[in-house]
């Protein structure tokens, strides 16, 4: 009788959790140049599971992304594996790896190359997006010092990442970012950079008292992005 009562309580609590999740509101942070196509499918599947839930998608801060989680500004975020030291108050779940690519104008003399080494960028300009160090160091890319050592001009600065993309499209600068090998970026080409290993992309939420809807969103993301983890051609060049 005691076991049956305990089972009933657990069933009632689970039913209540599902009802609460369906009426919930979650905020998801998203990074620049992310895989928007797969992400939209994740949101669509989540909304199908919880049709009355509200999902807000906001840009993540490259300077202090972990603080957005801790302060409650976002419920779920995406991170590069090098952005944290396994902070115990946050639960990180690895999703897939992203290889580094050089973004450039299609008319650049390097645009026809199948892959590049950092030394190949000698004499080229690489634009910073205001928080340049933060954006690149977060994903283990080349530092300003490493770029300067091979003769890259790092003097061009844009106040926003969008402004940096415009400069790339104009052909006045390049940029180095992690992105999927099959990603299409309008108005520019991307060439794999061979000098750096892929960086791991993780999804994260606060570890304490995880809500059912947050857990469900993360499980959907793990399943959707699982195909990348088993297909290295999406994140690294095949030469």
What are these regions (language model features)?
Residues 86-93, 98, 159-209:
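Beta-alpha-beta core module
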Residues 23-84, 158:
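Central regulatory/effector-binding core of bacterial HTH transcription factors
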Residues 29, 100, 116-137, 225:
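Short loop->beta-strand "edge-of-pocket" segments that line small-molecule binding or catalytic clefts
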Residues 37, 80, 124-148, 211-216, ...:
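Secondary-structure junction motif
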Residues 38, 172, 190-233, 237:
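A late-sequence structural motif
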Residues 61-74, 80, 131-189:
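Hydrophobic hinge/microswitch elements
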Residues 19-20, 90-100, 104-126, 211-215:
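Flexible hinge/capping segments at coil-to-helix
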Residues 1-17, 23:
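Alpha-helical "hinge/linker" immediately C-terminal to small N-terminal DNA-binding modules
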């Amino acid at each position: 009788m005691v076991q049956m009562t305990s089972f009933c309580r657990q069933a009632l609590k689970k039913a209540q959790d599902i009802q609460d999740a369906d009426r919930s509101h979650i905020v998801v942070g998203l990074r620049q140049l992310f895989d928007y196509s797969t992400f939209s499918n994740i949101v669509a599947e989540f909304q199908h599971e919880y049709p009355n839930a509200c999902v807000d998608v906001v840009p993540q801060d490259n300077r202090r992304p972990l603080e957005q989680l801790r302060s409650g500004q976002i419920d779920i975020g995406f991170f590069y594996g090098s952005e944290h030291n396994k902070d115990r108050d946050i639960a990180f779940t690895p999703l897939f790896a992203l290889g580094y690519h050089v973004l450039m104008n299609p008319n650049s003399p390097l645009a026809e190359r199948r892959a590049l080494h950092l030394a190949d960028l000698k004499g080229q300009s690489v634009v910073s997006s205001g928080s340049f160090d933060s954006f690149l160091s977060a994903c283990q890319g080349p530092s300003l010092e490493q770029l300067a050592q091979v003769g890259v001009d790092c003097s061009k600065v844009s106040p926003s990442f969008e402004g940096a993309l415009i400069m790339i499209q104009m052909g006045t600068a390049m940029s180095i970012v992690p992105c999927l090998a099959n990603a299409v970026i309008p108005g520019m080409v991307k060439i794999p950079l061979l000098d750096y290993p892929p960086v791991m992309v993780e999804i994260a939420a606060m570890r304490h008292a995880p809500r059912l809807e947050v857990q469900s969103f993360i499980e959907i993301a793990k399943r959707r992005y699982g195909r990348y983890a088993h297909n290295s051609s999406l994140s690294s060049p095949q030469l």
